[in-house]
Curated annotation (Swiss-Prot):
Specifically methylates the uridine in position 2552 of 23S rRNA at the 2'-O position of the ribose in the fully assembled 50S ribosomal subunit. SUPFAM superfamilies: S-adenosyl-L-methionine-dependent methyltransferases. GO terms for molecular function: rRNA (uridine-2'-O-)-methyltransferase activity. Its main location: cytoplasm. It catalyses: uridine(2552) in 23S rRNA + S-adenosyl-L-methionine = 2'-O-methyluridine(2552) in 23S rRNA + S-adenosyl-L-homocysteine + H(+). It comes from the Bacteria. It is an enzyme of class 2 (transferase). This is Ribosomal RNA large subunit methyltransferase E. It holds the Pfam family FtsJ. It comes from Photobacterium profundum (strain SS9).
Length: 209
């Protein structure tokens, strides 16, 4: 891509970003990102989060989902967040920076969780997209498979899982796998999710050990 095309594309993105009503509302309410409205809508419909719960948030930076989850679970609950990117501290959130695909990071994450089991696993993870669907989709599916593996390790019986998934190759098989593991599975496309995006959220409740 030429520099001029990149510049024009970046300019369009910035204009869209700052004109976005969800960006403006997030700033007004003191939230870190527009992504908060996705988990807020999921919460209103599916009631995943409750006071006193333990929540794991994967791909947490810049912290919108963790910020919202911490408000809901309150002082009696806890939110354990992990991301390869750095994240400023948040009240009620224990943050671990690192790639949980690495054994040392995974062990550190599990240490923060144990001996308790987790009530909810959240994942808003996505790879850096290149625009090449043939390479982007497998990388995205790899991340959601890792999130599901985390559920198998830490999720309590009847626990819940909400994960961002991009529709495409591997989606149907992944959905079938989740249906085998949970009693109730729904697909959500929050209003704040951009129409052109292939992202949807699989919301699963009633984890079956």
């Amino acid at each position: 891509m030429s520099r001029n095309k990149q510049s024009a594309s970046s300019g369009r993105w910035l204009k869209e970003h700052f004109d976005d009503k969800y960006v403006q509302e997030a700033q007004k309410r003191g939230y870190r990102s527009r992504a908060i409205f996705k988990i807020e809508e999921i919460q209103k419909k599916d009631k995943l989060l409750k006071p006193g719960m333990t929540v794991v948030d994967l791909g947490a930076a810049p912290g919108g989902w963790s910020q919202y989850a911490a408000e809901v679970v309150g002082d009696e609950g806890q939110v354990i967040a992990c991301d390869i990117l750095s994240m400023d501290s948040l009240p009620g959130v224990s943050f671990l920076q690192g790639d949980f695909r690495e054994e040392a990071v995974l062990s550190a994450l599990l240490e923060r969780i144990q001996p308790d089991m987790v009530d909810v696993v959240l994942s808003d993870m996505a790879p850096n997209m290149s625009g090449n669907l043939a390479s982007d989709q497998p990388r995205a599916m790899y991340l959601v498979e890792l999130a599901l593996e985390m559920c198998k390790q830490v999720l309590a019986p009847n626990g819940s899982f909400a994960v961002k998934v991009f529709q495409g190759e591997g989606f149907d098989q992944y959905l079938a796998e989740i249906r085998n593991m949970f009693k109730v599975v729904k697909i959500r496309k929050p209003d704040s999710s951009r129409d052109r995006s292939r992202e949807v959220y699989i919301v699963a409740t009633g984890y079956k050990l």
